[in-house]
Curated annotation (Swiss-Prot):
InterPro entries: PCRF, Pep_chain_release_fac_I, Pep_chain_release_fac_I_sf, Prokaryotic/Mito_RF, RF-1
Region Disordered, annotated ranges: 283-303
Full protein name: Peptide chain release factor 1
Entry PTM: Methylated by PrmC. Methylation increases the termination efficiency of RF1.
GO molecular function: translation release factor activity, codon specific
Function: Peptide chain release factor 1 directs the termination of translation in response to the peptide chain termination codons UAG and UAA.
Primary gene name: prfA
Keyword Heme: no
SMART domains the record matches: PCRF
Residues carrying N5-methylglutamine: 231
Organism (species): Campylobacter lari (strain RM2100 / D67 / ATCC BAA-1060)
Pfam family, one: PCRF
Length: 355
């Protein structure tokens, strides 16, 4: 019974309130921080649980009043409303009770790379960057370009953007994979549609506790920054290239104004890539039944097609097709895709958890 599953959460919430008011604990900053975070995470479940349990009590109370000559009709009407409310609250609670992705509240590194298609792929990376930035602005997320390499005719060969905001990972984690674009290039005189592809990786920003790197495993090179076309744009050796020797992962950063800033940014990206690698290995070891049905976020998985002649955007994981490509890209309206993906994932997770 759902009500029984809620009791441990209510009990723990009361325990946390008691602990947080304890003078001895209030002097321990790290303990206070951990308990406050746990309390905050429980609040949505507890609030909804209290509303649900009150609804159950109200239903029973109104059932007793049905035979009352004066209050019977009023109780009947109230009971009707409560019976409609009950299943809605149950569905909301089931979703709240799903195991939480520990990365959901984290900031992300959004990495986009041009794949097949040459200049057209680079141009589309530029278009997608603008769309993601608009999406970030729509949700009041902060963002900064960590590193970039411009395409020869515009756009980017590759770019990494740090997006900061509560729930950034939870909203954008489904973007990882191969995105295919179909459109007529401006240089195409015959009007033929060209197909190109880009890859997107979503990596949660991690701290030193989550990923520890042995300094002896790193090869750090400094060099002069190069701009569009490869020309030097800096007379000092401010660009930094970090190679993680055990994995062969290489991170280059030259967008910052100082060597220190570039090294700091490159280390953050390296940690995120190593964390992503660990997550992919972990997912690969899990049984198929536990994997998300919407995909693993693997860069090689083709997840979406953008067809400009048809103004169509299709997400292949959930067979979603929208004929609003221009509006979605220009307005950064990715929630029109994100929301159905989240709903699908939650439905699959509910089946797996037997809720």
């Amino acid at each position: 019974m759902l009500a029984d599953k809620l009791k441990p959460f209510l009990t723990r919430f009361d325990e946390l309130n008691t602990l947080l008011s304890d003078v001895n604990i209030s002097n321990d900053i790290s303990k206070m921080t951990a308990l406050s975070k746990e309390q905050k995470n429980l609040e949505p479940i507890v609030e909804k649980a209290k509303e649900y349990l009150k609804t159950l009590d109200d239903i029973e109370e109104n059932k007793l009043l049905l035979s009352d000559p004066e209050l019977g009709e009023l109780a009947k009407e109230e009971l009707k409303n409560l019976e409609l409310l009950k299943p809605n609250l149950e569905e909301e609670l089931k979703i709240l009770l799903l195991p939480k992705d520990p990365n959901d509240d984290k900031n992300i590194f959004l990495e986009i790379r041009a794949g097949t298609g040459g200049d057209e792929a680079s141009l589309f990376v530029g278009d997608l960057v603008k769309a993601y930035i608009r999406y970030a602005e729509n949700r009041d997320y902060k963002y900064e370009i960590v590193s970039s390499s411009e395409g020869s005719v515009g756009g980017f060969k590759e770019i990494i953007i740090l997006i900061k905001g509560n729930g950034a990972y939870s909203r954008l984690k489904y973007e990882g994979g191969t995105h295919r674009v179909q459109r007529v290039p401006e240089t195409e005189s015959q009007g033929r549609v060209h197909t190109s592809a880009i890859t997107v990786a979503i990596m949660p920003e991690v701290d030193d506790v989550e990923i520890q790197i042995n300094p002896n495993d790193l090869k750090i090179d400094v060099m002069r920054s190069s701009g569009h076309g490869g020309q030097s744009v800096n007379t000092t050796d401010s660009a930094v290239r970090i190679t993680h020797i055990p994995t062969g992962i290489v991170v280059v950063n030259q967008d910052g104004k100082s060597q220190h800033k570039n090294k700091e940014s490159a280390m953050k990206v390296l940690k995120a890539r190593l964390f992503e690698m660990q997550e992919q290995e972990r997912l690969a070891k899990e049984s198929e039944a536990r994997k998300s049905q919407v995909g693993s976020g693997d860069r090689s998985e083709r997840i979406r097609t953008y067809n400009f002649p048809q103004n169509r955007i299709s997400d292949h994981r959930i067979n979603l097709t929208l004929y609003r490509l221009d509006a979605i890209l220009e307005g950064g309206l990715f929630d029109e895709i994100v929301e159905p993906l989240i709903a699908y994932y939650q439905a699959e997770a509910l089946k797996q958890e037997n809720l």
